Structures are given as structure tokens and as C-alpha cells.
Curated annotation (Swiss-Prot):
Keyword Cell cycle: yes
UniProt-recorded Gene Ontology molecular function terms: protein kinase inhibitor activity
Official protein name in the record: Cyclin-dependent protein kinase inhibitor SMR11
Species per Swiss-Prot/TrEMBL record: Arabidopsis thaliana
Start-end of Low complexity biased regions: 27-38
Region annotated Disordered, chain positions: 1-44
Length: 154
């Protein structure tokens, strides 16, 4: 019996391993890169004739010498720097998305934070939660000091 290799790619007549070019007239095709509004033109460099798609700005310098079929040696420092830049870009975009989703907070010039409008109620029950009470005067501790000693001290 012939054993099949589990990791071996099998070609069938109906499916192709080659990537397909998106067709804007066909609704089920892959959307074009230009239609993706989350990425700017600076972040995407495409050259359809050579099959190059680059997201990292550090890779733009290698766009003339690199393509999908070519093997290019890259130093470890360049790889780490590229990973760092890409991760930083992802983190900043996620923070930007989260900051848009959160209710904007109002800050005054001296750094004090104003509560958001949803938590500000004019109800008298809420006053104790939002406003601190007046400071309490400490009670004087009464001491019984002998009047003769008091005259000497004061």
C-alpha cells in the first residue's frame, strides 16, 4: 500500500495554487487593495507586474531588488527593526481605534479631570458620591492641668 504524505500539496483540476487577481465586476472575488480604507497609500506599495506587496516602510528600500520568487539575505538587525516597526504600527492603530470607541474625557488646563456627562446627575442622592464633604474640625482634647503649672507654662 502506498502511504500518502500529509504535508504534500495535491493539485486538482478544479483548484489552482496560484493566487487569483481580484475582479471588481465579480461580487465574490477578493476586494482590491485600493478599496481597503484602513491602510493609507504610504503603507501599501504594490507592483502587480512583479507581484510585490509591502506593508513595512523599511522594506520600501528593497522593493527594487526583492520579489516573491527571489531569495534575499537580510540581517538579523533589519528583521528585528522591521518587526518592531510593524508591531508598533499595529499597537498604535489598535490604541487609536480604542480611543475613538471610548467616550472622550474632558480635561481642564491644570490637569484636573471632569467626570463624563453620563455620570453627572443633578440628583441629590448622587451629590455624596461626586462631591466630597466639608472637612471636619477636630475636637480639642481636654486636659486637666493644674492651674499653678498652667501659669508657669504660659
Amino acid at each position: 500500500m502506498e502511504q500518502e504524505e500529509p504535508c504534500e500539496a495535491k493539485e486538482t483540476a478544479s483548484s489552482s495554487i496560484e493566487p487569483k487577481t481580484p475582479n471588481p465586476n465579480v461580487p465574490d472575488s477578493i476586494p482590491a487593495i485600493d478599496s481597503d480604507s484602513s491602510l493609507s497609500e504610504e503603507e501599501i506599495v504594490t507592483e502587480k507586474d512583479r507581484g510585490i506587496v509591502t506593508l513595512s516602510p523599511l522594506c520600501k528600500q528593497r522593493i527594487d531588488s526583492a520579489s516573491i520568487s527571489d531569495c534575499v539575505l537580510v540581517s538579523d538587525d533589519e528583521i528585528i527593526e522591521s518587526l518592531y516597526q510593524n508591531l508598533l504600527r499595529v499597537i498604535l492603530s489598535l490604541q487609536q481605534i480604542q480611543s475613538v470607541a471610548v467616550v472622550p474625557e474632558i480635561w481642564c488646563f491644570d490637569g484636573c479631570k471632569t467626570p463624563p456627562p453620563s455620570s453627572r446627575n443633578l440628583d441629590s442622592n448622587m451629590v455624596s458620591d461626586t462631591c466630597p464633604g466639608a472637612p471636619m474640625k477636630l475636637t480639642k482634647i481636654s486636659r486637666n492641668i493644674d492651674s499653678g503649672l498652667r501659669r508657669k507654662l504660659f
